[in-house]
Design a protein with these regions (language model features):
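Conserved internal alpha-helix in NAD(P)-dependent oxidoreductase domains
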Residues: 70, 77, 88, 92-99, ...
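N-terminal Rossmann NAD(P)H-binding glycine-rich loop of SDR-like oxidoreductase domains
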Residues: 4-26
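NAD(P)H-binding glycine-rich loop region in Rossmannoid oxidoreductase-like domains
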Residues: 54-93
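Active-site Tyr-X1-5-Lys
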Residues: 142-163
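N-terminal Rossmann-fold cofactor-binding loop
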Residues: 33-39, 54
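Conserved Rossmann-fold NAD(P)-dependent oxidoreductase catalytic core, especially the SDR/UDP-sugar
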Residues: 99-146
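Rossmann-fold cofactor-recognition segment
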Residues: 45-56
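SDR active-site strand-loop-helix element
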Residues: 9, 33, 72-76, 115-121
Length: 163
């Protein structure tokens, strides 16, 4: 059986870095996509860094075409403080970038076994709404900041892509 080829956006971020380590430990060939031009992790047999920006549809398409992943883990996003301070950039990265990624997958007709979109608890509103019961999948969507709204948009695109 062939090793999985996993394309990870946001691969140099906190969660992305951990995901890359876990995937490599499991024997996957990982293609890390991020804005970082000189990542701390060096390219090796199991890891290949692909410099690119989620706001660049052509760069996303080219990277996916060249890597032909079997799996995609989409972790790349502008976080809450940056979405607050730079709302239009947050929209471009978190919404348009996610859309560019889904569109490229469709146009290239990638044979994906799995596409994982990382959402956020920010779509459900502040923790104070839920108390000790926590958040459940059937709870209402109540984003309380732009980051949460942008993640709701990503969830909608993920559902549409899946169908």
């Amino acid at each position: 059986m062939n090793r999985p080829r996993v394309f990870v956006t946001g691969s140099t971020g906190c969660i992305g870095n951990h995901a890359v380590n876990l995937l490599m430990a499991e024997g996957a060939e990982v293609y890390g996509f991020s804005r970082t031009t000189s990542p701390e992790r060096q390219t090796c047999d199991d890891y290949h860094h692909v410099s690119g920006d989620l706001t660049d549809a052509d760069a996303i398409r080219k990277a996916l075409d060249e890597t032909q992943p079997t799996h995609i883990i989409h972790l790349g996003a502008l976080q809450t403080p940056d979405c607050r301070d730079y709302p239009m950039l947050g929209l471009e990265v978190n919404v348009l970038g996610t859309g560019f990624l889904f569109r490229a997958c469709q146009e290239l007709k990638l044979s994906l076994e799995r596409f994982v979109f990382a959402s956020s608890s920010a779509v459900n509103g502040p923790r104070s709404l839920y108390g000790s019961k926590g958040v459940h999948t059937d709870d209402p969507i109540q984003p309380f900041n732009l980051y949460g709204y942008w993640k709701v948009a990503g969830e909608g695109m993920a559902r549409a892509f899946h169908q």
